[in-house]
């Protein structure tokens, strides 16, 4: 029966995942957010903050996004990939929110390895401390193309204003990064 339902939906171009997203959004309470995680393989057990790469935008953490399509774009080329819907309750959690600005650019540059020569500089140390003094982060997504622009800024090829204008034009959406066990405990897969 389920196979025939899916076959009918496919034939009629019904976007089942979009319907599922709408139903999940209807069930959200205050302080709850619907987030999406694209995984290259199935998640077994609880969310593990140590599984992610250390050279992601904000270091190790559990990376999620605001849209199904966004999560899909990160894992669509992998055979065993999955998209997870998450119910995230942000009440009583400390958030660090970033905008497209110099602080955001330099924090990403640090975690992606472009500021290794300056890792002991007080400004970089302050950025690192601020990025870890929270339970979760909300920040603009920086894909590899955006990172090339950030690197051009770090290398002195662009001013910070030129860099911000280039990056603001890409607008890939916002990412939510869970960075503490408290945030994980308030997230339901």
Predicted stretch roles:
Residues 2-57:
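ADP-ribose/NAD+-binding catalytic cleft of ART/PARP-like enzymes
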Residues 8, 74, 149, 153:
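Residues that form generic nucleotide/phosphate-binding pockets
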Residues 17-19, 30-33, 49-60, 66-128:
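ADP-ribosyltransferase catalytic core
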Residues 40-42, 68, 182:
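A broadly conserved detector of short glycine/acidic/proline-rich loop/turn motifs that flank catalytic sites
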Residues 60-63, 137-139:
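Short cationic amphipathic helices and targeting signals
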Residues 87-189:
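Active-site and NAD+-binding cores of ADP-ribose-processing enzymes
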């Amino acid at each position: 029966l389920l196979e025939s339902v899916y076959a009918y939906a496919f034939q009629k171009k019904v976007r089942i995942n979009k319907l599922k997203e709408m139903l999940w959004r209807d069930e959200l309470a205050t302080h709850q957010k619907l987030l999406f995680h694209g995984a290259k393989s199935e998640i077994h057990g609880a969310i593990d903050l140590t599984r992610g790469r250390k050279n992601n935008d904000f270091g190790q953490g559990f990376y999620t996004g605001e849209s199904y399509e966004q999560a899909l774009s990160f894992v669509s080329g992998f055979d065993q990939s999955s998209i997870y819907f998450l119910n995230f309750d942000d009440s009583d959690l400390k958030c660090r929110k970033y905008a497209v600005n110099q602080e955001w650019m330099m924090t990403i540059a640090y975690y992606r390895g472009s500021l290794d020569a300056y890792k002991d500089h007080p400004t970089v140390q302050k950025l690192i401390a601020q990025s870890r003094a929270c339970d979760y982060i909300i920040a603009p997504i920086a894909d590899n193309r955006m990172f090339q622009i950030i690197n051009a800024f770090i290398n002195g090829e662009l001013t910070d204003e030129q860099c911000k204008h280039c990056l603001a034009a890409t607008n890939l959406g916002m990412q939510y990064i869970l960075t503490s066990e408290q945030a994980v405990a308030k997230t339901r897969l």
